[in-house]
Design a protein with these regions (language model features):
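Small cysteine-rich, disulfide-bonded extracellular modules of the LU/uPAR three-finger superfamily
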Residues: 1-104, 110-139
Length: 139
């Protein structure tokens, strides 16, 4: 089992269908937000990951800093244009205060009130376990 950093294949397809708009408050008439969920080293995530799942999602070793589903990725901004070969979206740092858990990677996914729901966007591999013990965990 491994977490392999990748843009999710399903995201590429859904992007071409017009199902992702990082800047708009709604997409296809439905409210949408992007979340970051964290996973243990037992998770298998990569390009073929299709959606958010609770399987091997992290849990708190103490306290309640982390909730299933993760946290909203706030204030997205899109960079790129005609003069550059790469475009990307950047979010504010996602921060868990008073955190006590270990994470090996994460999944950014779209959560909305209409279909498609919880579609994977990108898998983040941290390159190993990172642990917070009653401290701040920032991605």
């Amino acid at each position: 089992m491994a977490i392999t950093q990748a843009v999710a294949n399903v995201f590429k397809q859904e992007l071409l269908k017009g199902n992702h708009n990082f800047i708009g408050a709604t997409q296809n008439g439905t409210a949408a937000a992007y979340y970051l969920a964290l996973y243990t080293s037992s998770a298998t995530l990569g390009a073929t990951t299709t959606a958010y799942s609770t399987g091997n999602e992290i849990t708190n070793t103490a306290g309640t800093a982390y909730s299933a589903g993760g946290q909203v990725c706030g204030n997205p901004s899109v960079t790129g244009g005609a003069s550059v070969a790469t475009a990307y979206v950047d979010f504010d740092n996602v921060v868990w205060a008073s955190a006590s858990f270990t994470a090996n990677g994460g999944l950014i996914y779209r959560q909305d009130s209409g279909g498609p729901t919880n579609d994977a966007v990108v898998v983040l591999a941290f390159g190993g376990d990172f642990t917070a013990t009653n401290g701040t965990f920032t991605v």
